[in-house]
Amino acid sequence: MAPQNMPAVSIDINMFWQIINFLILMFFFKKYFQKPIAKVLDARKEKIANDLKQAEIDKEMAAKANGEAQGIVKSAKTEANEMLLRAEKKADERKETILKEANTQREKMLKSAEVEIEKMKEQARKELQLEVTDLAVKLAEKMINEKVDAKIGANLLDQFIGEVGEEK
C-alpha cells in the first residue's frame, strides 16, 4: 500500500524538465540537422549505389577482357600451330628438293662415268686393234722371213695369240 500523503502517480520535476529539454532538442535537431544529415545519408546511399553499379560494370568488363584474352591466346596458339605446320611443310619440301637435286646430280655423275667408261673402252679397243694389227704385221714378217711350213705357221699363230692374251 502506498503511503496516504503521496499521490498514486508522482511526476518528478527533473524528469519533466528532461522531457521538455529532449523535445526542444528534437525540434532543433529536426529543424537544423535533419536536412543536412539526410543529404549526407542520401549522398552516401547514392555513392554506394554508384559504386555497386561501377563494380558490376567493372566485373562485366573484366569478364569481357578475360574472354577477349582467351580468344587472343587461342588465336595465337592456332596461328603458332599453323606456322609450325607451314615450317614443317617447307622443311619437307626443301628436303624433297635437296633429294631430287642429289639424285639428279648422281644420275648425271653416273651418266658421265658411263660415257667416260665407254670412251675408255673405245680407246682400249682402238689401242688393242692397233696392237693386233702391229702383231699381225710382225707375224706376217716372221712367216715371210722364215719361209714357214704349215706346222711352224700354226705354232707361230698360237704364240701370237698367247702374246696378245698376255698384253691385254
Swiss-Prot record:
Keyword annotations from UniProtKB, A to Z: ATP synthesis, Cell inner membrane, Cell membrane, CF(0), Hydrogen ion transport, Ion transport, Membrane, Sodium, Sodium transport, Transmembrane, Transmembrane helix, Transport
Membrane topology of this protein: Single-pass membrane protein
GO molecular-function term, one example from the UniProt record: proton-transporting ATP synthase activity, rotational mechanism
Main location: membrane
Gene3D superfamilies membership: F1F0 ATP synthase subunit B, membrane domain
Quaternary context: F-type ATPases have 2 components, F(1) - the catalytic core - and F(0) - the membrane proton channel. F(1) has five subunits: alpha(3), beta(3), gamma(1), delta(1), epsilon(1). F(0) has three main subunits: a(1), b(2) and c(10-14). The alpha and beta chains form an alternating ring which encloses part of the gamma chain. F(1) is attached to F(0) by a central stalk formed by the gamma and epsilon chains, while a peripheral stalk is formed by the delta and b chains.
Native species: Propionigenium modestum
Name of the encoding gene: atpF
SUPFAM superfamilies: F1F0 ATP synthase subunit B, membrane domain (SSF81573)
Function text: F(1)F(0) ATP synthase produces ATP from ADP in the presence of a proton or sodium gradient. F-type ATPases consist of two structural domains, F(1) containing the extramembraneous catalytic core and F(0) containing the membrane proton channel, linked together by a central stalk and a peripheral stalk. During catalysis, ATP synthesis in the catalytic domain of F(1) is coupled via a rotary mechanism of the central stalk subunits to proton translocation. Component of the F(0) channel, it forms part of the peripheral stalk, linking F(1) to F(0).
Further facts: The ATPase of P.modestum is of special interest because it uses sodium ions instead of protons as the physiological coupling ion.
Cross-referenced NCBIfam families: ATP_synt_b
Keyword Glycosyltransferase attached: no
Protein name: ATP synthase subunit b, sodium ion specific
GO biological process: sodium ion transport
Residue stretches spanning the membrane: 9-29
Superkingdom of the organism of origin: Bacteria
Recorded family membership: Belongs to the ATPase B chain family.
Subcellular location: Cell inner membrane
